[in-house]
Amino acid sequence: VEVTRAVAEKLGVKVEFKETQWDSMMAGLKAGRFDVVANQVGLTSPERQATFDKSEPYSWSGAVLVARNDSNIKSIADIKGVKTAQSLTSNYGEKAKAAGAQLVPVDGLAQSLTLIEQKRADATLNDELAVLDYLKKNPNAGVKIVWSAPADEKVGSGLIVNKGNDEAVAKFSTAINELKADGTLKKLGEQFFGKDISVQ
């Protein structure tokens, strides 16, 4: 929200936010119910890349592995046979399963971290920004990030528009680059996530 406000201010336009469910967000953009999607979207699938365009990234995120503060888990290799709290339909759940983890089904990150704290699960593989947000809001959670995906596996999130809006993408990208250059994106990342998330 804050990045979108800063971009709108740079462009001299008024922004109206419409909250929607994740599952209907891209369909709403495609149908013209929204002009822009600004919700940590990376456009990684070929289907989305064929339908939508993305501005320069305003944030970067990748997978992180979270375990209790006293855990011996240090990497994905360590979760083989280990109880790992995951949403069964997520990419992270698939990645944990492929690593040989024993999946404990959950509805989301907060439940995953609660199960780890309660020693009903040992780890979770999840999105870095979601975890950083949780840890910023819950500094005494008793869990920590024990492994992070390398920079070349991180995905950049930008402002998303329907394909063919080249002028909008160019304007958004210029504004985002200016916000990087003047330190605004770094400041927002540190304020909300405890670190600069504007760089890969």
Model-derived features with residue positions:
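Periplasmic-binding protein-like
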Residues: S59-A67, E128, L132, K136-N177, ...
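Alpha-to-beta junction loops
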Residues: G12-K14, K30-N39, K83, Q118-A130, ...
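Flexible hinge/capping segments at coil-to-helix
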Residues: E56, A67-T84
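Extended ligand-binding regions for polar small-molecule ligands
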Residues: V1-K10, S90, G156-K195
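Short helix-loop capping/hinge motifs at secondary-structure junctions, enriched
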Residues: N69-A77, V104, G164-A170
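Hydrophobic residues within well-ordered alpha-helices
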Residues: V7, L29-K30, I79, I116-E117, ...
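Extracytoplasmic small-molecule ligand-binding "clamshell" domains
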Residues: V1-V41
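Short helix-initiation/N-cap motifs at beta->coil->alpha
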Residues: E16-A27, L88-S90, V104-Q118
